[in-house]
A protein has these predicted regions:
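Catalytic Walker B motif of ABC-type/P-loop ATPase nucleotide-binding domains
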Residues: 158-162
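Conserved ABC ATPase "signature" region
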Residues: 100, 104, 111-129
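ABC transporter nucleotide-binding domain
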Residues: 176-263
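C-terminal coupling/interaction segments
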Residues: 265-304
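A short, flexible loop at the N-terminus of ABC-type nucleotide-binding domains that lies
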Residues: 1-4, 9-25
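Conserved ABC transporter NBD signature motif
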Residues: 62-78
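The feature captures the beta-strand-to-loop junction immediately N-terminal to the Walker
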Residues: 36-41
């Protein structure tokens, strides 16, 4: 669905004396039905790549095509579900107003706007916030509103920039479920994030950018779920009995209260985590103890 070939983008320096490369000869293909993560240090080119794919910027070299069209033409004709890293909204808009306005902008028929907004309110757990002004929302709730706005148009191109930023562990886990629900054969999902652990759990592949170059593309947790088991650490407040019941092979981490080491395949661990949260446990942290993606990321950035 997405075809990127030798893509380049340069900017003029502040005083115009030299050019600064933001993207350098990037080639990548994203198939329909695929979830691809985009990772890289600050300044690696992630935002520039997203801006080109959404038609906000034009490349200075190479090309990008989405379903055979130039990005701007695709977005104008078929739309895109986009969550920006920063969500600009009038502070006096209510949650419901923001959703309805965005539904209209996304091309939802007028007669379907109310029902679509209600669906997103229920899906993203915004019922108690629907009449609140945006300025009254917590950071995590505002992020959920951003997700609701991004997904209300139901596009086949989904681009999410730091989607779990500000979410608590409960909604971070719920977001994983949402991504699984979003998958469909014709849809392409791009997730840009600094959170390598989340990308490893969510994506089929992760593209690692560094200084504008695509250093490598790594198979992630979803695609590698049938490979050797992963080792995760979980920190939970006052839930030792639940841990023992849901993860019988869990072992306490020496010297760390309320922290356990889990071993298993990623889908199995995710199911156990969902069960733990549903049982009322307060999950403080859940992350891989050792990550192949993290190793690949470090090697790419360090030039190994």
């Amino acid at each position: 669905m997405i075809e990127i070939a030798a893509l380049g983008k340069t900017y003029r320096s502040l005083f115009g004396s030299r050019t600064v490369p933001a993207l350098d000869n990037v080639t990548l293909r994203v198939a329909p039905g695929e979830v691809v993560g985009v990772a890289g240090p600050n300044g690696a080119g992630k935002s520039t790549l997203i801006s080109i794919l959404l038609g906000f910027l034009k490349p200075t070299g190479g090309q990008a095509r989405i379903a055979g069209q130039a990005p701007r033409a695709y977005v104008e004709s078929r739309g895109a579900s986009y969550l920006p890293e920063l969500l600009p909204l009038p502070p006096r808009w209510t949650t419901e107003t923001a959703l309805r306005r965005h539904a209209t902008l996304a091309g939802v028929p007028a007669e379907a706007v109310a029902a679509r907004a209600q669906h997103m309110v229920e899906w993203l757990g915004l019922e108690e916030h629907r009449k609140k002004d945006v300025r009254q929302l917590s950071k995590g709730t505002l992020q959920r509103l951003g997700l609701a706005q991004a997904l209300i148009g139901d596009s086949d191109l989904v681009v999410l920039d730091e989607p779990t930023h500000g979410l608590d562990p409960l909604w971070t886990q719920r977001f994983r479920d949402i991504v699984r629900e979003l998958r469909r054969p014709a849809r392409c999902i791009l997730i840009a994030s600094h959170d390598l652990a989340e990308l490893e759990r969510l994506a089929d592949r992760v593209a690692i950018l560094h200084q504008g170059r695509l250093e490598r593309v790594v198979s992630a947790g979803v695609a590698a779920a049938d490979e050797e088991p992963a080792v995760y650490r979980i920190s939970v407040t006052g839930a030792a009995e639940m841990i023992a019941r849901i993860f019988p092979s869990a072992t306490p981490v020496e010297g760390r209260a309320n922290e356990w080491r889990l071993r298993g395949r990623v889908p199995e661990l995710n199911r156990g985590l969902s069960e733990l949260i549903a049982a009322g446990a307060v999950v403080v942290a859940f992350a891989p103890e050792s990550s192949r993606l993290e190793s690949e990321f470090r090697a790419a950035v360090e030039g190994r």
